[in-house]
Amino acid sequence: MSFSGRKLFVSSMKRIIGLLLIVGMAGWNTQTIPENNMLMYSSTFRQIQEDIRDCVITPDSAARAWQENMRNIRATFHNGDTCRMGDSTYFVFPIKGYTPQKSIGGRGMGYRAEGFDLFDMDVRGSHPAHDLFVFDRNQDNVDDRTWKPIDVLAFTSGIVVAAEKDWKYDSDLRGGNWIWIYDPCLDGLFYYAHNNVVFVEPGQWVNAGDKISEMGRSGYNAFKKRSPTHLHLMFLKLNKDALPEPGDTYDWLMNSIVKQ
C-alpha cells in the first residue's frame, strides 16, 4: 500500500471510530452509570480531543460527543452544592513559590475569550487562558533562583479527566504535556499545558495545592526559544447543556494562597 493510501486508510478508520463513539454515547443513560466508569469517561474524553485535533470529526459531532460525556462526568461527581468560594484556601496559586503579581503574564491582559471554539480547529486567534511565567532565562526547566524544578500545583480540587505525558520535542502538537481536571464544585474543567513531567493519572482525585506536574516547555510553540517558560492555565465552565464556556480566572488567581 502506498503512503497516500495508508494515510487515507488511517483517516477513514478514525472517522468510523468517531462515528461509532457518538452513536454509542447517544444511548447512555446518565442516571444509571456507576462511579467506576470514570476511566471509560476519561478514555472517551481523550478520544474526542484527538478526533478534534486530527480533524476527523465535525465540530457539531464533536460538541454532541463532548456534551454526552461531560453530562456523565457531571452526574457522577457534581452534587449541586454551593462552592465555598469565600474560603481563602479554595484556590492555591498553581506555581509553587511564585506570587500571582509576579507570575501572571500581562497583568491579566493576555486573556482573550472572543471567538473561542473548542470543537473547531480552524478557529484561531482567541486565548481564553492566563500564562503564568517563571524565572528560567536559560530555558532548562529549572528555577534560576533555586536550581530546582518548579512544581505545578492543582489550582482547585477535582478529578483528573485526562493527561498527556509523552510529548516529544519534534511534535507539532501545541499543548505539549497537558492535564485536564474537572472541579465538581465549580462545575468546570481546568486545563494545564506545557508541563515537563506529569505526576497524575486519569481517574485520580487531587486536592488544591497537590503537586500535579513540573513546569516545562512542551508544545510546538512553547518549546521554541522565543517563548519564555510558562504554564498555560485555562478554565472552561460547563453551561446547563454541559457545553464549555471560557471563564476568566484572573480574580481567583490574584486572591489564591501561595505555597512556598
Please report, for each region that a protein language model flagged, where it lies by residue.
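A short, sequence-level motif marking secondary-structure junctions
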Residues: 195-199, 249-252
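Zn2+-dependent peptidoglycan hydrolase active-site motif and core
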Residues: 147-149, 153-196, 226-230
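Polar/charged, compositionally biased leader and regulatory segments
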Residues: 28-151, 250-260
